[in-house]
């Protein structure tokens, strides 16, 4: 089994990471846009929806890839509790990556507003249901909050493996198969 992720897994990881960063940044920014004039707010919400749907498609590809390609093993030096923490956090990251775009899409489906995907109006299969829209919005908000927390933990753990442990874990997802630096002599 390779000691690094496949080129496809690395590409999907970093592509989705960039999209997620942009999407979360846009989402946090756009909630502060005044409701009047409505055209500006509608424009940015449609951009957010378009990025979300695109991201959802990339995530679907990533999930299928991950289910059909095993992750490389962690080094033997990684303690058992960290293995459990890594597996749990990865599962939760995937859950957030699925629930977040799905809850956003469903929430948009239960409003009177159309879903516009990069300028193309998608069929409106839902109906105006404020209670369902609010439920989906709350799920979306809770999920994004959990997702931001998990991303912070993920980045912190990756940097710990790169800068403190120096055990090659970070290099498994880097763009090239760099040799793992040896332990520090401190």
Language-model-detected regions and their locations in the chain:
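Membrane-embedded alpha-helical bundles that constitute the cytochrome b-like, heme-associated redox core
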Residues: 1-186
């Amino acid at each position: 089994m390779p000691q690094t992720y496949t080129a496809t897994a690395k590409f999907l990881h970093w592509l989705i990471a960039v999209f997620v960063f942009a999407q979360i940044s846009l989402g946090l920014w756009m909630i502060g846009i005044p409701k009047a004039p409505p055209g500006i707010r509608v424009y940015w919400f449609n951009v957010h929806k378009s990025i979300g749907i695109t991201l959802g498609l990339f995530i679907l590809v990533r999930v299928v890839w991950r289910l059909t390609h095993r992750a490389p093993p962690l080094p033997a030096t990684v303690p058992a509790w960290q293995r459990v923490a890594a597996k749990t956090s990865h599962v939760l990251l995937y859950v957030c990556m699925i629930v977040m775009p799905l809850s956003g899409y469903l929430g948009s489906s239960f409003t009177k507003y159309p879903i516009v995907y990069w300028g193309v109006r998608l069929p409106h299969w839902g109906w105006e249901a404020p209670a369902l829209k609010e439920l989906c919005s709350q799920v979306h908000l809770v999920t994004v909050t959990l997702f931001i927390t998990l991303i912070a933990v993920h980045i912190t753990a990756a940097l710990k493996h790169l800068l403190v442990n120096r055990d090659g874990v970070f290099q498994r997802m880097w763009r090239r198969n760099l040799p793992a630096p040896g332990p520090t002599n401190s």
